[in-house]
Each structure stands twice: as structure tokens, then as C-alpha cells.
């Protein structure tokens, strides 16, 4: 069969060489990320659900006066304002002082902060929180990472595809997909997901260069540089703060590396397409594997300061134990929720206060838009007709097959099929993960790559029969999608049928139908033959198929903007933890103490972690990982803790926890009262009569102490005792604490779950209690080792580059002298 030439892409920037045109595309992606969060960039809004605080004491009492336009919460994303903001505020405050906060004294009577994977204290890009106000940094971090996602996805797709419009379409589909948009304010999810396309881009660029032709070989030193940078990006995925998402990044990379190890001898139709006719260099799979292992080692070593402490805490946490299916069954991606791939708001939206899905909206968000789904059709048609259509690149079919297979595997993980158990038994720690639907990250990325392959297939000139097959398949798929949607409406959503023409549901269906029809018509027009009679140097007309192809990424962007742009609250900065009389009273108390917050309902109390933003310490907390020993102790005092429904505020065990104040909402009376009511305003503050001091000796004498930093407590013993005595310190027990008495290493042991004890020799004057666990020491050592490996690779690559430049310079000089000699003769 005669081989057909591809449709030439329009020369919109015909006067520019290749890289400036790529730069223009990347600039457009950055502009889109700015538009998506324009209120943050241009209006100074904060990307935080700060209005949730206006429903909680003590801020609730001042909401009407300070924010008269406030009527209801925009989108109740509690974890962002309850967890992420206090953690970022705490870490950035101490990093500005030159201290890495390894311990957090503000939650759970003290807990390991570095082992809280979402603290991300080693993640370099979190320095932005230290350079500007934390509440503003949330928005700018999102803009930066959203732009990085778009640019790196575009770069990766340019490596594996020939056409810029295809790469642009895939980049837009992924950077604004449902997963990224829904988790945008959860910084650890966003930051970790960013390194998926970055790692694949560096890896693929390295492999493409290395597997190029013998006339332009890549020196082995530069291959090592590429693999080292790949490992560095994989390590960043571990440092960014969410190990589950990081694991999905690593799974995707591992699968793709295995695929490329098999196909490394073939040239993908990207930037080396013009050299594809020259024979490629032979490769040894073993040598290729060894260099991939180098990248994996560097990635593990770079991320070691984060994942080693997390694994240590996991061993002691409430999640330790056997895998329990019932604990994650409700968080799976159900068959019915696949309808949200077509209509993202099929089950409503929290912003509209009408969500009725089976689980959390954010956990199940993963749409890339119906237009992107339609673009799968030409890619799959080209895959299944690869023998009939002898296209220019057989490897493009291999790529399509790989990403289709990865998408199906990801779906099986998200939907808790039996394949999920394979990962549970083969990957350490996988059984303790929650939220299987978070595999939507891999689903969305695979779907975006398939959409890009679809655009590539649309622009490939094929014979009339293949084009007709594509048109038929597109119409059939569009009909099937419409049928599936109608079945879902009839059996699941009776609300769609009430007030038929004016209901919320019908508006969503109308949006779906519009993009479906426009997408089908645009794809049909793009797949036609070009109208410039094959003259590649003639600028196509505005209505030509090649020019219309650039409307595909525009259509994908418009659809995703319509679905997702309004989801994330962008609010006034003044709402974020503003001062009140009660918070000022607590902050002005010079003593060291802990507090207990109680209430009557989920919103009518001072939630755990919020006090951390005020610099106060509490015995409860909110985190996915905390030690089971402390959880057992706290639940012995109050079953179900941490909770607002606390009725054991008179328990003597609170004395051991150094609880000085009990905080209750203003409309809540406590009988009997836990202590003296000293303030009755926007909070009711009770002072308990006899809390034990934080540090004391055997005879009960309180010791003076202060935190030098979160990792270092200094205790002044004062008047020495006639003989040895014991120092008792109220702190949740955790491995990694060391005590130094007058400069000599002492022995610190646990007396109970919440009290640690050290022997003080007679005449002791000072004790320093320091938190520096072995997991952190080992992790930092491995990170330094990885830094050395990367530096050595870069130095080797630079020497190779200098040597190459020198040889080229010598060759040019020799050639010039020969030409001069020949001219003189």
C-alpha cells in the first residue's frame, strides 16, 4: 500500500525556528495558569477556604461586623484551613530562623513533624512560603506548579509526538483536569503530581537523545547527566509531601521506563524524526537498566529525609497492621461515578451545595473533558488499523498501546479490582494507603497523552477508507456517550427530570451536549485533507484543517475552565485567622501550657490544629498519621478522641498532659465547670486549677524551661539536689529524643505514653532535650550522597561537553588552515 505523507502543521510562526515556537506554546500555557487563578495574581486574593473560620468560634462572633457580605461558605474544604495552613505557617516561621522543625509541639501533646509526610520541610519550592506571607504563598505556589505541569507535559509530549498542536492539547487536558483542579489548594497533592510530567520529560529527552543516530551520538556522560536529573525529579516527588501521590508518580515512571527499555532502539516521531532514516545505535538492555537503576537510587536517596521518617511513624501509627478492605471500600471509584468523566457535575458540586455523590467530591474528581475523550477515538482507530495504515511511525502505536494499558491498570487500582491486591502484597506500605481513587492522577495523565495521540492521528493523512472509518467510529462513540449519559439520568438522577428545562442537571447536560457536538464537528473538519495542494510553505487559510487543529486545545481549555475554574475559593486575605480578644488573651499568657477545645457540633468548636496558627499547644490534633500509643491514652480519657464531644474535662489525666485551659464556644455551658471561668466572650475560657508543670523533678518542684526551637528544649534545674533525682517531662513519647545533662549524654526513657524521664546526677545545673531521630540522620546522609552522585554526573557531563567543544574548535581551525593554504596555492 502506498505510504502517505503527513499533513503539514500550519506555519503560524513561519519566521521562527523550532525552539522559539515551542517557547511561545509554553508561554501560552503559563498565561492559561495565570488566567485560571487570576484573582490570586491580580486581585491579591488568597487560595484558601478562609470563610470556613467565620462559622467557628471565636471568629464567628465577629463575622457579621467584619464581613457583612458573608452569607455562606464558598466551598467547605476544611483540611486546607485546618491542616495545611497551620503546617505551612509553622514550618516557614522556623525555616526563616534557620531551623528545620523536626518536632511539632502544637499537636497531640507533641508529634514528629518531619514524619508528617505533608510537612514537606525538605521540599525546595516551599521556600516560597518563607519569602512572602504564607496566606498569599498558597496561591502563588499553585500558579507556579500549575505552569510547571503544563510546560513539562508539553515538553514530554513534544519528545514523543511530532506536532506542537498535539502536545499543546495534551498539556492543557492534564494541567486543568479534574484531579489537578480539585486538589489545587491541597499543596502536597499538587506539588507531588507536578513531578510526574517533569520526570518523564527529562527521562524521555535523555533516551531520545541517546537512541538517536550514529551521526549525532550522545556521549555516555550526558546520558548519565540525564538519568541523574531524572532521579533528582523522582526524589522531588517524594520530598513534595504526599507519599501516596509520589508512589503513583513512581509507578507511572517505572512502567514507562520498562516500556522504553524494550523500545529504546526505535525513534519516536518527535524532534529526532528528521533523522529517523539513519540507522540507530545498538543498545544493551542490561546497560540501559543499570542506568535506570541509577536514577531510581538517586530518587530514593534524595527523598530519604522525608520517606524514612514517614515509614518509621507508619510502624508506630494507628494504621499499622493488616490490610482491611472495609476501611477504604467507600473511597473507591465506583462505576456510577464514571459518569463524571462526561459531566463533572453530574452528582452536583459542593460550590452549589447540591452534591449527592457516594463519597467526597474531591476524591472522585478526574474528568479531562468530553472533547479530550473524543480525541481518544482517532488514536485508538489508528492503533487497531495499524496494518492497514502504514503510518510514518510504528512506535506511535506502541506508545498508544502503552498509555491505554496504563489507563486500564490505573482504573483497576481506583476501582479496587482484584489487581489492587497484587499491589498490596508486592509494594511495601501500599496496604496502609487510603483513597484508592487518587489513582485518578495516573488515569488523567494517561488520558491526556491519549488525547494528544488522537490529535496526532487526526493530522496524519490517510486514505479515504481510513478516514471514513474514523468518522464512523467518532459518531458511534459520540452516540454511545450520549446513551450512557441518558441511562445514567434515567436510573440515577431523577432530579434531572424534574423541572426539565430549568433544573441544575439539565444545564449540565446542555454543556455536555454542546461540547460533544462541537468536538465531533471540529474533529471531522480537522481530519479532512489540506486545501493548500500539498504546498507546505504556503500559509494555510483560516478554515483549513491544519489551522482548525489549533482550536482543539482551545476547546479543551474552555470546557475544563467551565467545569473547574470556579471550584477553588479565592477570598479576602483578612479572613485568615484574624485576632480576637480571646486569642489575644491566650497568646499573652507567658507560661507554657496546653489547651483542650470542646464544643457541641462539628462547626461549633475550635477545631484541632487551628490553635497551631496562634502558636498554642493542644492535646488533640488532626492528621492522617499519629502514634497508636498516644491514641490509646487519649481514648482512655475520652473515647472517640480527637472529638468535639468531650465530656471528660475533669479527668485527672489532663493534669499529666499539662492542660491549663479548656476552651468552649460562647453558647455552651459546662456543668460542672472544669475550672474558673476567666473569660466569657467570643470563647469561654476555663482555667483548670491544678495542671502539672511541663517539667518537674521527683519532689514535684517545677523546673524552668523554654524551647530554643521545636527540636530543642532547655531545662534549668536550678538548685541542685543532695543526690540523684529524676527529671519528668510531659511530652508524647516517640523515638529520637536524646537528653544531655551539663553536656554529658544521659538516658531518656518513657515512664508512660505521655511522660518521659531522665536521671539527673547530683549537682546538675542544666538539661538539654533534643529531637534528632536516626531516620532523619540516615535520610540526610543519603541525600548528601545523592547530591554527590548528581554533582559527579554533572561534572562528567560538563567535561565531556568541553572536550566536544574543544575537538570541534580544533577541527574548524584545521579546516580553515587547509582552506587558506589551498587558496594561497
Task: Please identify what each model-predicted range represents.
Residues 40-160, 165-195, 333-363:
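Active-site lumenal/periplasmic loops and adjacent helix-entry segments of GT-C-fold
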Residues 34-43, 95, 99, 116, ...:
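Membrane-interface helix-loop junctions at the exits of transmembrane helices
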Residues 1-2, 7, 11, 22, ...:
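Contiguous transmembrane helix-bundle modules in multi-pass membrane proteins
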Residues 248-299, 383-392, 461, 531:
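Perimembrane helix-loop-helix junctions
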Residues 328, 558-701, 710-714, 718-723, ...:
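Extracytoplasmic
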Residues 374, 620, 678-681, 689-806, ...:
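Active-site-proximal, structured, solvent-exposed surfaces of multi-pass membrane proteins
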Residues 29-32, 148-160, 164-207, 222-262, ...:
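Membrane-embedded helix bundles of polyisoprenyl
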Residues 53-93, 99, 296-382, 432, ...:
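Periplasmic/ER-lumenal interhelical loops and adjacent helix-loop junctions
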Amino acid at each position: 500500500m502506498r505510504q502517505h505523507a503527513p499533513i503539514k502543521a500550519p506555519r503560524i510562526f513561519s519566521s521562527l525556528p523550532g525552539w522559539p515556537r515551542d517557547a511561545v506554546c509554553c508561554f501560552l500555557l503559563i498565561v492559561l495558569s495565570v488566567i485560571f487563578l487570576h484573582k490570586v495574581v491580580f486581585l491579591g486574593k488568597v487560595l484558601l477556604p478562609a470563610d470556613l473560620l467565620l462559622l467557628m468560634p471565636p471568629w464567628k462572633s465577629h463575622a457579621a461586623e467584619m464581613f457583612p457580605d458573608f452569607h455562606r461558605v464558598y466551598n467547605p474544604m476544611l483540611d486546607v484551613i485546618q491542616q495545611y495552613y497551620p503546617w505551612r505557617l509553622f514550618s516557614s516561621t522556623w525555616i526563616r530562623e534557620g531551623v528545620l522543625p523536626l518536632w511539632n509541639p502544637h499537636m497531640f501533646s507533641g508529634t514528629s513533624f518531619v514524619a508528617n509526610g505533608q510537612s514537606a520541610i525538605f521540599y525546595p519550592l516551599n521556600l516560597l512560603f518563607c519569602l512572602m506571607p504564607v496566606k498569599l504563598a498558597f496561591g502563588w505556589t499553585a500558579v507556579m506548579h500549575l505552569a510547571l505541569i503544563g510546560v513539562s507535559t508539553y515538553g514530554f509530549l513534544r519528545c514523543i509526538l511530532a506536532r506542537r498542536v498535539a502536545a499543546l492539547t495534551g498539556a492543557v487536558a492534564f494541567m486543568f483536569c479534574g484531579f489537578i483542579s480539585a486538589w489545587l489548594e491541597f499543596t502536597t497533592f499538587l506539588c507531588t503530581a507536578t513531578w510526574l510530567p517533569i520526570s518523564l520529560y527529562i527521562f524521555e529527552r535523555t533516551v531520545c537523545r541517546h537512541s538517536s543516530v550514529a551521526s549525532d551520538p550522545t556521549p555516555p556522560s550526558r546520558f548519565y547527566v540525564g538519568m541523574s536529573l531524572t532521579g533528582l525529579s523522582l526524589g522531588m516527588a517524594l520530598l513534595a509531601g504526599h507519599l501516596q501521590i509520589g508512589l503513583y508518580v513512581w509507578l507511572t515512571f517505572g512502567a514507562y521506563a520498562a516500556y522504553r527499555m524494550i523500545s529504546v532502539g526505535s525513534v519516536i516521531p518527535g524532534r529526532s524524526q528528521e533523522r529517523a532514516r539513519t540507522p540507530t545505535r545498538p543498545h544493551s538492555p542490561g546497560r540501559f537498566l543499570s542506568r535506570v537503576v541509577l536514577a531510581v537510587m538517586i530518587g530514593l536517596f534524595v527523598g530519604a529525609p522525608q520517606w524514612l521518617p514517614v515509614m518509621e511513624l507508619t510502624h508506630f501509627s494507628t494504621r499499622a497492621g493488616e490490610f482491611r478492605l472495609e476501611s477504604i471500600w467507600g473511597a473507591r471509584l465506583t462505576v456510577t461515578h464514571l459518569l463524571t468523566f462526561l459531566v463533572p457535575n453530574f452528582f452536583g458540586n459542593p460550590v452549589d451545595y447540591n452534591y449527592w455523590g457516594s463519597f467526597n467530591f474531591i476524591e472522585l474528581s478526574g474528568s479531562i473533558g468530553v472533547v479530550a475523550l473524543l480525541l481518544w477515538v482517532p488514536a485508538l482507530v489508528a492503533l487497531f488499523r495499524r496494518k492497514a495504515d502504514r503510518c510514518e511511525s510504528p512506535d506511535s502505536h506502541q506508545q498508544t498501546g502503552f498509555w491505554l494499558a496504563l489507563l486500564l491498570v490505573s482504573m483497576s487500582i481506583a476501582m479496587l479490582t482484584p489487581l489492587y491486591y497484587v499491589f498490596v502484597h508486592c509494594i511495601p506500605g501500599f496496604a496502609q494507603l487510603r483513597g484508592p481513587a487518587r489513582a485518578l492522577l495516573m488515569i488523567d495523565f494517561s488520558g491526556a497523552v491519549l488525547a494528544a495521540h488522537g490529535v496526532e492521528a487526526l493530522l496524519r493523512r490517510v486514505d479515504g477508507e481510513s478516514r471514513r472509518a474514523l468518522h464512523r467510529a467518532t459518531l458511534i462513540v459520540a452516540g454511545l456517550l450520549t446513551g450512557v449519559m441518558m441511562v445514567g439520568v434515567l436510573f440515577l438522577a431523577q432530579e434531572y427530570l424534574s423541572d426539565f428545562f430549568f433544573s441544575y442537571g439539565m444545564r449540565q447536560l446542555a454543556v455536555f451536549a454542546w461540547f460533544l457536538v462541537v468536538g465531533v464537528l471540529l474533529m471531522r473538519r480537522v481530519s479532512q485533507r489540506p486545501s493548500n495542494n500539498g504546498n507546505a510553505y504556503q500559509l494555510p487559510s483560516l478554515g483549513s484543517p491544519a489551522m482548525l487543529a489549533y482550536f482543539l486545545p482551545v476547546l479543551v481549555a474552555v470546557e475544563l475552565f467551565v467545569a473547574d475554574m470556579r471550584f477553588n475559593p479565592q477570598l479576602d486575605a483578612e479572613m485568615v485567622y484574624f485576632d480576637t480578644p480571646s486569642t489575644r488573651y491566650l497568646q499573652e499568657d507567658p507560661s507554657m501550657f496546653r489547651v483542650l477545645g470542646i464544643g457541641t457540633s462539628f462547626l461549633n468548636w475550635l477545631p484541632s490544629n487551628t490553635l497551631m496558627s496562634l502558636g498554642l499547644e493542644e492535646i488533640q490534633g488532626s492528621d492522617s498519621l499519629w502514634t497508636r500509643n498516644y491514641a490509646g491514652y487519649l481514648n482512655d480519657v475520652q473515647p472517640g478522641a480527637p472529638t468535639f464531644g468531650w465530656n471528660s474535662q475533669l479527668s485527672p489525666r489532663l493534669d499529666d498532659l499539662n492542660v491549663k485551659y479548656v476552651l468552649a464556644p460562647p453558647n455552651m455551658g459546662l456543668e460542672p465547670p472544669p475550672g474558673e471561668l476567666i473569660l466569657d466572650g467570643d470563647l469561654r475560657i476555663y482555667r483548670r486549677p491544678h495542671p502539672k508543670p511541663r517539667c518537674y523533678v521527683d519532689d514535684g518542684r517545677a523546673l524552668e524551661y523554654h524551647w530554643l526551637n521545636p527540636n530543642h528544649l532547655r531545662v534549668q534545674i536550678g538548685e541542685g539536689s543532695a543526690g540523684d533525682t529524676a527529671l519528668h517531662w510531659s511530652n508524647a513519647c516517640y523515638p529520637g529524643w536524646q537528653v544531655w545533662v551539663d553536656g554529658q549524654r544521659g538516658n531518656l526513657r518513657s515512664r508512660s505514653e505521655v511522660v518521659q524521664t531522665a536521671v539527673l546526677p547530683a549537682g546538675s545545673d542544666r538539661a538539654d532535650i533534643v529531637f534528632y531521630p536516626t531516620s532523619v540522620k540516615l535520610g540526610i546522609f543519603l541525600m548528601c550522597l545523592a547530591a554527590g552522585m548528581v554533582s559527579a554526573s554533572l561534572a562528567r557531563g560538563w567535561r565531556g561537553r568541553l572536550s566536544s567543544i574543544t575537538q570541534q574548535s580544533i577541527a574548524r581551525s584545521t579546516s580553515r588552515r587547509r582552506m587558506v593554504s589551498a587558496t594561497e596555492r
